[in-house]
Amino acid sequence: MLRARTAKKDFTALPLTECLAKTYRNAHGVTAAGRTVLDHALITGAVAALLLERLPKCTLPFYPEGVDRIVSAHDVGKVCPTFQHKIHQAAGSLGTFPELADADPSLEQDWRGHASISFAALKAVQGNVFIPQIVGRHHGVPPKESYTASCNAYGGDAWQKRREELLALIMGERGWPDVSSKTQALLLMGLTTVADWIGSGELFDEPQKDWAPLVRKAVDHAGFLPLSLQTGLSFEALFGFSPRGVQQAFIEQVSGPGVYILEAPMGMGKTEAALYAAYRMLEQGKAGDRKST
């Protein structure tokens, strides 16, 4: 039996300047409109870029150039009628936008919310199979993949066009990064989730504030600080006793990153030997980046 095709509806999309990503509680204790989706996109991209700066240089080959742009795109799915209805209602501004009058936020349970729209939007505009999954899973669950970017549920062509406008602002003249494997995609999902968490912090609540000077402070507060290492310490200075022969022999064998096995009876100091060997690698710049003191 043939099923009749659902007729395409005519939608009018909000301008990007009115598409909210966040609300916040203002100084009077009232829930108010917070950052726009574009602002939040730029914030999370900047957070991701700073996180990458602070990772050990040896890990950077795992991250494709321009990965911050993927992170910025994670919430493009919030540019849709159901999410905007919900958030403007919370902010007390729903009546200002007749374009949202017929939207029903309760329907989002059918497609698992805005992350699934992000998945569909990215699938529609670029060819890498992993990028839609990265943005679609930034809340830790797989997206609903059976909806297309321009379907009625997601706001039709008008809202997909608005999402494409947002993506164009994020990308500029640059192309999409090349994500080459599922393993790499999983790594980038983690980066996206952490950057979103930091970029959603209260430091960025007030939309009137310039967000750029707050990025470093937010990343610092989240604990992603450069390693500070006091160099030149002896084994005895760290542990209060001179190394045993087996410890000294092990330490001398550790000349670079790798897997080393020290077999010795309990009480011979295997833990201290391993810790001091790791300290030596950090001191020599062979185990990631550090700041010497």
Regions found by a protein language model. Give the residues of each.
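Conserved pre-motif I regulatory segment
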Residues: 230-263
